[in-house]
């Protein structure tokens, strides 16, 4: 994904579209591309989090709009928490982690020490955080 400027209807919805690799020269489009690449890598490198045997919970309904939205995935050895703020203002949201200990901000690589399973997390407006119990390996 690079923020395409060509309509989905050009050459039909599923028709071939011109490739615009020059988009990667724009820092915002490069950042968007890199974010999608890391999300795909997360999915491909950690299949055990995305199987029918993993534990999955989500709080993403309309009633969760003001309290933040959360998705939690757990396997026997790994945990992932996605926390999103889809409002117009920055927020501090109560987050419940499945385990305490060392976590990682998957998109920045920063370590996060989780001492209490329930704690507040700052999330800017229109943003999200992905926290994992394993580091992102480039």
Predicted features, each with a name:
Residues 105-118:
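Solvent-exposed beta-strand/loop surfaces of large extracellular or lumenal domains
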Residues 81-83, 130-131:
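Short hydrophobic-aromatic micro-motifs
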Residues 1-4, 86-89, 128, 136:
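Short, glycine-/Ser/Thr-/acidic-enriched flexible segments
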Residues 86-101:
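Surface-exposed beta-strand/loop patches in extracellular or lumenal glycoproteins
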Residues 115-138:
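C-terminal beta-strand-rich structural cap/linker in extracellular carbohydrate-active enzymes
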Residues 4-7, 91, 111:
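Conserved protein kinase catalytic core
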Residues 2-80, 86:
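Glycan-recognition and catalytic regions of carbohydrate-active enzymes
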């Amino acid at each position: 994904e690079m923020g395409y400027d060509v309509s989905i209807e050009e050459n039909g919805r599923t028709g071939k579209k011109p490739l615009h690799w020059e988009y990667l020269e724009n820092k915002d489009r490069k950042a968007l591309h890199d974010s999608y690449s890391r999300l795909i890598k997360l999915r491909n490198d950690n299949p055990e989090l995305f199987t029918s045997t993993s534990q999955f919970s989500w709080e993403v309904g309309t009633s969760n709009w003001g309290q933040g939205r959360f998705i939690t995935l757990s396997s026997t050895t790994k945990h992932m928490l996605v926390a999103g703020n889809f409002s117009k203002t920055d927020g501090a949201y109560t987050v419940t982690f499945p385990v305490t200990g060392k976590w990682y901000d998957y998109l920045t690589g920063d370590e996060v020490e989780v001492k209490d399973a329930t704690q507040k997390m700052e999330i800017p407006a229109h943003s999200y955080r992905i926290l994992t119990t394993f580091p992102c390996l480039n």
